[in-house]
């Protein structure tokens, strides 16, 4: 197939997906190790392309990678309870610093990755105090300090920014009614934002190709039930990520995708091709086989009637 023929075929394949996703809200959670260098530049270009096609984008970034680098620089070993970082006052200051660094880098990348035919001007990046948080408190006898959990998402204010054509950028930080700031989980934050907005899609960009089954094979599709079995059966499964996916799907989000964000074009392939990329998770099985029931008989007859009449 020639290059032109391949382009035409690919564009025809993508067209229905482009039409369907126009005007839909998509929340993208990104591990912060992807938000640097060439990977950030490529990702920013793809996000700008999606915005130009009419998707309403909310980007939630992580902070663990850069926080670990800062801790290493001061010879400090981070403390965890399970998968959650224990946030003392010194760490909280670094959390705020990291959020500012990442936000600035992402804004600059989105601003500079616009190509002239695509947009007349760079996208507006909207940030704000959209998240109300509360402390996690004491878990299994461990005081989590300034590590928090989401109390409320100001969905109305986020929608106002999206209605105005902005790309919304959210850091994993939340503030309490008493004026304290808390360090949040990126997975939980992205999940809660997607639920509050009733997003069409929640996409997690990670360092992995997707979710692997217990035997090591890549799962292209999973249902909520299969994810819950995987969490139970596979101790190496990314539980925080999968719990966020299940929580989102059980509360109105249509689809969750988990992709390798370092792979060039993985987000576009997942959204606009039949084959997709990574792992796609839905509430119900993509294909299920069961014993026929008596109430299936009319549908079975309707299926075989054209063959019987030939």
For each predicted feature, which ranges?
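Conserved GNAT-fold acetyl-CoA-binding loop/helix
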Residues: 304-310
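Charged, low-complexity C-terminal accessory regions
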Residues: 106-107, 276-280, 306
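Nucleotide/pyrophosphate-binding catalytic subdomain
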Residues: 1-255, 259-262, 293-299, 304
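Active-site catalytic pocket residues across diverse enzymes, especially alpha/beta-hydrolases
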Residues: 71-74, 271, 275
């Amino acid at each position: 197939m020639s290059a032109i023929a391949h382009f035409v075929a690919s564009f025809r394949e993508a067209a229905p997906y482009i039409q369907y996703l126009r005007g839909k809200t998509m929340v993208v959670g990104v591990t912060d190790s992807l938000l640097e260098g060439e990977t950030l530049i490529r990702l920013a270009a793809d996000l700008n392309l999606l915005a130009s096609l009419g998707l309403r984008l909310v980007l939630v970034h992580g902070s663990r990678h850069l926080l670990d680098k800062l801790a290493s620089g001061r010879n400090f070993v981070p403390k965890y309870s399970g998968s959650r970082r224990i946030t003392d006052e010194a760490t909280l200051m670094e959390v705020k610093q990291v959020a500012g660094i990442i936000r600035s880098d992402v804004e600059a990348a989105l601003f500079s990755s616009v190509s002239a035919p695509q947009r007349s001007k760079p996208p507006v990046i909207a940030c704000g105090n959209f998240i109300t948080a509360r402390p996690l408190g004491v878990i299994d006898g461990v005081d989590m300090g300034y590590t928090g959990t989401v109390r409320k998402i100001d969905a109305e204010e986020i929608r106002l920014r999206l209605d105005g054509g902005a790309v919304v950028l959210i850091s994993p930080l939340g503030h309490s009614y008493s004026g304290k700031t808390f360090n949040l989980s990126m997975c939980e934050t992205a999940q809660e934002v997607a639920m509050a907005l009733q997003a069409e899609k929640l996409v997690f960009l990670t360092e992995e190709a997707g979710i692997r089954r217990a035997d090591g094979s890549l799962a292209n599709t999973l249902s909520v039930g299969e994810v819950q079995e995987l969490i139970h059966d596979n101790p190496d499964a990314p539980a925080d990520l999968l719990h966020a996916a299940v929580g989102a799907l059980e509360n109105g989000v249509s689809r969750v995708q988990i992709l390798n964000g370092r792979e060039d074009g993985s987000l576009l392939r997942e959204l606009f091709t039949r084959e997709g990329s990574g792992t796609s998770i839905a509430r119900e099985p993509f294909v299920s086989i069961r014993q026929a029931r008596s109430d299936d008989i009319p549908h079975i007859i309707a299926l075989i009637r054209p063959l019987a009449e030939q």
